[in-house]
């Protein structure tokens, strides 16, 4: 399935139906009086978070969504039918922003969340509403109110417990494929991964979601390479596994490059709990392994894990450590959630 994480969409709620000018006509009733019904209300625009979606690809092919108009009122005091709503279905993690992309209108993080984005126009009054003691046969009715319209941006930030970050070809996709059922494209050239990928990791009977983020290079926050567009998906991660290619020229410099890009992006990415690992260690000689490990240790100011997704060395240790950090963060988030005060 193709991946799309942002889309610009036009939405419009339905116009209200017009009121009706009508008079009661029955045999033997000479002055039946007004009986024009009100117009129906226009349909609303809703956005709903549903299960089974992980991309906004549907909104590449359809960008305009309009709710139905309300029906006009009818005689015999019959109100027009309400216009049907239009519902935009999005995956969990979708933000709704205004046209300028500066104001977040809603953030849908849980399946089942549903918000009313635009309200349909009210129906107009029929002539029965205008009957007074001095005007027993009004010949006026109101038109329905117009619906609302606006352009919005849908922006998806994948919800994952942990994220894989690193330079291109650091072994992130290989690690994801080795630890989950995901099947990312793997090749020996930079930027093999062009879109984020998700997989479910199972460790000791417990699970967490792992995201593979496309590689960063120096200047990504300024648009170099594929830029930092996909770093938004890291914002929701509770922890990061930073993979540094052991076969790179200098492991310490590679680590610092990615850390600089995380700091330049902002939004607290450089403050997230981080586990540092030297990858592809099966391809290193003992002397080079020791040298790269020391370089990375000095740069990260912590002892890195040594792992190889191909041979399986250090993989389970990394996953268990990642799981412990994720569960610790989950517990901290639950502790911070406000609890309703008890009331008798």
From Swiss-Prot:
SUPFAM superfamilies: Obg GTP-binding protein N-terminal domain (SSF82051), P-loop containing nucleoside triphosphate hydrolases (SSF52540)
Residue ranges of every copy of the OBG-type G domain listed in the record: 160-327
Name of the molecule in the record: GTPase Obg
Superkingdom as given in the UniProt entry: Bacteria
Pfam families: GTP1_OBG (PF01018), MMR_HSR1 (PF01926)
Cofactor: Mg(2+)
InterPro entries membership: G_OBG, GTP-bd, GTP-bd_Obg/CgtA, GTP1-OBG_CS, GTP1_OBG_dom, GTP1_OBG_dom_sf, OBG_GTPase, P-loop_NTPase
Residue sites binding Mg(2+) per the record: 173, 193
Role according to the record: An essential GTPase which binds GTP, GDP and possibly (p)ppGpp with moderate affinity, with high nucleotide exchange rates and a fairly low GTP hydrolysis rate. Plays a role in control of the cell cycle, stress response, ribosome biogenesis and in those bacteria that undergo differentiation, in morphogenesis control.
GO molecular function: GTP binding; GTPase activity; magnesium ion binding
Residues the record lists as binding GTP: 166-173, 191-195, 212-215, 279-282, 308-310
Lineage of the species this protein comes from: Bacteria, Pseudomonadati, Pseudomonadota, Alphaproteobacteria, Hyphomicrobiales
Quaternary organization: Monomer.
GO biological process: ribosome biogenesis
Native source organism of the sequence: Xanthobacter autotrophicus (strain ATCC BAA-1158 / Py2)
Family statement: Belongs to the TRAFAC class OBG-HflX-like GTPase superfamily. OBG GTPase family.
GO CC annotation, single: cytoplasm
Gene, per the UniProt record: obg
Major enzyme class: hydrolase
Domain Obg positions: 1-159
Localization annotation: Cytoplasm
């Amino acid at each position: 399935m193709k991946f799309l994480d942002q889309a610009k969409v036009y939405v419009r709620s339905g116009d209200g139906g017009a009121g009706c000018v009508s008079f009661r006509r029955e045999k033997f009733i000479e002055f039946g009086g007004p009986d024009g019904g009100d117009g129906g209300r226009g349909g609303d625009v809703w956005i709903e978070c549903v299960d089974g979606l992980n991309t906004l690809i549907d909104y590449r092919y359809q960008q305009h969504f309009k709710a139905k108009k309300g029906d006009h009122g009818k005689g015999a005091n019959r109100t027009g039918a309400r216009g049907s709503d239009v519902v935009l279905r999005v995956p969990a993690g979708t933000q709704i922003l205004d046209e300028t992309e500066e104001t977040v209108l809603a953030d849908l993080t849980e399946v089942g969340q549903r918000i009313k984005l635009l309200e349909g126009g009210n129906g107009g009054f029929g002539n029965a509403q205008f009957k007074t003691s001095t005007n027993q046969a009004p010949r006026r009715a109101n038109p329905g109110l117009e619906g609302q319209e606006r352009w919005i941006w849908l922006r998806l930030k994948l919800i994952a417990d942990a994220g894989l970050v690193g330079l291109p070809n650091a072994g992130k996709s290989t690690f994801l494929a080795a630890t989950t059922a995901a099947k990312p494209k793997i090749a020996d050239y930079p930027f093999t991964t062009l879109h984020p990928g998700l997989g479910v990791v199972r460790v000791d009977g417990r699970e967490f979601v792992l995201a593979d983020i496309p590689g960063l290079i120096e200047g990504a926050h300024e648009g170099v390479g594929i830029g930092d567009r996909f770093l938004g998906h890291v914002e929701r991660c509770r922890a990061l596994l930073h993979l540094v290619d052991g076969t790179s020229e200098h492991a310490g410099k590679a680590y610092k490059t990615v850390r600089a890009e995380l700091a330049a992006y902002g939004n607290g990415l450089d403050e997230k709990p981080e586990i540092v690992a030297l990858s592809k260690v099966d391809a290193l000689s003992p002397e080079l392994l020791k040298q790269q490990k020391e370089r990375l240790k000095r740069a990260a100011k912590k002892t890195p894990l040594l792992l190889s997704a191909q041979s399986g060395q250090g993989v389970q240790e990394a996953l268990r450590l990642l799981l412990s950090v994720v569960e610790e963060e989950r517990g901290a988030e639950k502790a911070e959630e406000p609890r309703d005060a008890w009331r008798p």
